[in-house]
Amino acid sequence: MDGYTACLRKLRKVCTSVEKQIVKADDALTHSNGLISSLLNLLEQLAACEKVSFDTEPLAHFGDLQGRLRFKLTSAIESLLVKIHEDLNTIKEVASRFAEFRRSSFDVYNQHASKGNLSVAEAITAGPVCPSIASMLEWLQQLERMYAGLCEEKTEILEGITYNDLPQSQKELRRWKTQRNPLHLTAAMDQIRVFLADQKDA
């Protein structure tokens, strides 16, 4: 098999897997966004609980009401954080897969390029419905960097949550939904789908 055909075969297999992984990550992101909204609500309740004086009438008659409310809220918060971390772990798994896809694709490319089975001209040539090999390899690199960066940002946000500074914790959490969309490479993905459909019909 010539280098060009081998690379296209590898990239077709990888891109098919990439589509599935993007859906998996997008589902986790969507689910986590709902959890973040609930978490923000609980933090607001906890902040309000900390501000209220429970030593005056009529709240003074309820014993350790503040302590019991705080315990209930923090327990709910910790439970949500566990679920959010589970979603983040799913996204991290996807990021790891993308790193594997990029490495294995470049391995195939370098293997054939080093043996002279794939020229630079072949690697940079695109067809009517087929992106160039170079473009697809670059896209895989961008995808890997995008999801690695996304994981770092989400991890940083969760690490910034503290009960000692509830306003700052809320501020950090609001960044969760405003992070750059990892699917900003939609145009490239659309082109890849055309490529995959053409390969399937070939």
Language-model regions, residue ranges each:
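Short, low-to-moderate order helix/coil transition modules at the start of elongated helical scaffolds
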Residues: 1-74, 168-202
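Extended, amphipathic alpha-helical coiled-coil scaffold segments used for oligomerization/tethering
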Residues: 2-12, 37-142
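Amphipathic alpha-helical coiled-coil segments
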Residues: 18-21, 25-28, 32, 84-87, ...
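Charged, alpha-helical coiled-coil and adjacent rod-like segments in eukaryotic scaffold subunits
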Residues: 100-202
